Regions:
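Phosphate- and other anionic-substrate recognition elements at nucleic-acid/protein interfaces
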Residues: 1-195
Length: 195
C-alpha cells in the first residue's frame, strides 16, 4: 500500500501552486482551517536548508539535470525532463490530498526574459496537463489578480505578500532560514476565493 495516499481525504481542499523552475511553492488549504501544509520543490538544497525543520513546511529536492554545454535539441529535451521531475513531485502532493480544486499562478509575461518565460510557460502547461489527466479542476490566476485579491494591490512587492501572509498564518512568523516568497504566493492562491 502506498503510504503517501490519504485514504480519508478532507471534505474541502484547495491547493495553491506558484510554479517555478528553481522553487515551486505549494500551499494546501484543508477545510479553510488555521493550519496549512506547505511544500517547496527546489532544484538544490543548501546545507542550511537541508537541516531546516518546520511542522508545516516540507522542502523537496527534485532531480535537476544540467543543460550547460549542451546543443539546442539536447538542452530542450533535458529541460522537458526537469519539468517532468517537478510535475512528478506535484502529482505526489495531489495524490496525497485529493484537492477539490487547484489554483495555479499564471505566467507573468512582463517580468522575465523570453527564454525564462518560455520555460515557465512550459512548466505551467505540464502542470495543467497532469491535473487534466487526474480530472482535478483547476483555475489559472494572474499574478496581478492574486496580489490584488490578497493585499488589495495588484503591484504588491514580495515583502508585502510575505507580511500579509504572516498576518494570516502566525505559525510561519519565525521562518527566516529559507526563501518563502513562493509560499506566500501559493498561500494567497489557496485562499483566493475567500477574499
Amino acid at each position: 500500500m502506498n503510504s503517501s495516499v490519504n485514504l480519508n481525504p478532507p471534505s474541502r481542499c484547495i491547493i495553491g501552486i506558484d510554479p517555478s523552475i528553481n522553487s515551486t511553492g505549494i500551499c494546501v488549504n484543508i477545510n479553510n482551517e488555521d493550519i496549512f501544509d506547505y511544500y517547496i520543490i527546489t532544484s538544490k538544497l543548501t546545507k542550511k536548508q537541508s537541516q531546516f525543520t518546520h511542522p508545516q513546511i516540507r522542502l523537496i529536492k527534485y532531480e535537476k539535470n544540467e543543460t550547460k554545454d549542451c546543443e539546442y535539441s539536447e538542452k530542450e529535451r533535458i529541460k522537458t525532463l526537469n519539468f517532468h521531475n517537478i510535475v512528478s513531485e506535484i502529482e505526489k502532493i495531489i495524490d496525497k490530498y485529493h484537492p477539490n480544486t487547484v489554483l495555479i499562478e499564471g505566467v507573468s509575461y512582463g517580468s522575465v526574459g523570453s527564454a525564462a518565460l518560455v520555460d515557465l510557460a512550459g512548466l505551467n502547461y505540464m502542470i495543467r496537463q497532469a491535473l487534466l489527466k487526474k480530472d482535478i479542476p483547476f483555475e489559472i490566476v494572474s499574478p496581478t489578480s492574486n496580489k490584488k485579491a490578497f493585499c488589495g494591490n495588484g503591484q504588491a512587492t514580495k515583502d508585502v505578500m510575505i507580511d500579509t501572509w504572516k498576518r494570516w498564518d502566525s505559525n510561519i512568523n519565525n521562518v527566516n532560514e529559507i526563501k518563502i516568497d513562493d509560499l506566500a504566493d501559493a498561500f494567497a492562491l489557496s485562499v483566493y476565493r475567500e477574499n
